[in-house]
Amino acid sequence: MKRTFQPSVLKRKRNHGFRARMATKNGRAVIARRRAKGRARLSA
């Protein structure tokens, strides 16, 4: 049985990257929450 996590930098960036987050209203909300919390890394 193959493992479920098959890493790919491209897919990671496209789905969870900063630009992907900023593309939608909810994504921007995610960034705002993480900024408010003081996260060192805001996105993948």
From Swiss-Prot:
Keywords: Ribonucleoprotein, Ribosomal protein. GO terms for molecular function: structural constituent of ribosome. One of its GO terms (cellular component) is ribosome. GO terms for biological process: translation. It comes from the Bacteria. Gene3D superfamilies: 1.10.287.3980. HAMAP family: Ribosomal_bL34. Belongs to the bacterial ribosomal protein bL34 family. This is Large ribosomal subunit protein bL34.
